[in-house]
Amino acid sequence: MSLRESIAKNITEVLGDMDPPRPVFVTREPFDVEKLALTQFPALLIVTANETREEHTMGGNRRAVLEILINGFVRSDGREGFVQSVDEKRNEMIERVEETLNEDRTRELADSTAVKTRVTNIEVIQDRKPPLGEFVVTCEVHYTFTTTTT
């Protein structure tokens, strides 16, 4: 399995197992958020994005920075009274995602060394109409690995 895949799987598993409030639906397969059942919120879509690589040492060691996009979707039930707003639910889920990623920044990689995982950007998507809310958390995983020569 590639290191990109190992990192993406680890992040998907970790976010699926995080402490409450936790997402109900965590996947790497794109989906139509409009077709999710009320019971499938909050939902997260994990996507591997850009990666930069550079030589680290002459012995075939390289450094890489992999971007992971965590697309989050929340839903307010729209009732009056003591119910969280879309903004409150979105902020709470963003905080839980960041806290969970910070619990183990190494991503438990066997074939390389993950130097660090860090959140670099949080974007609130304004195009969603209530009761839906959307955000994208961008995180970077910095790691080193050894290339094989043939």
Where do the PLM segments sit?
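Charged, amphipathic alpha-helical segments and their flanking helix caps
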Residues: 1-40, 48-150
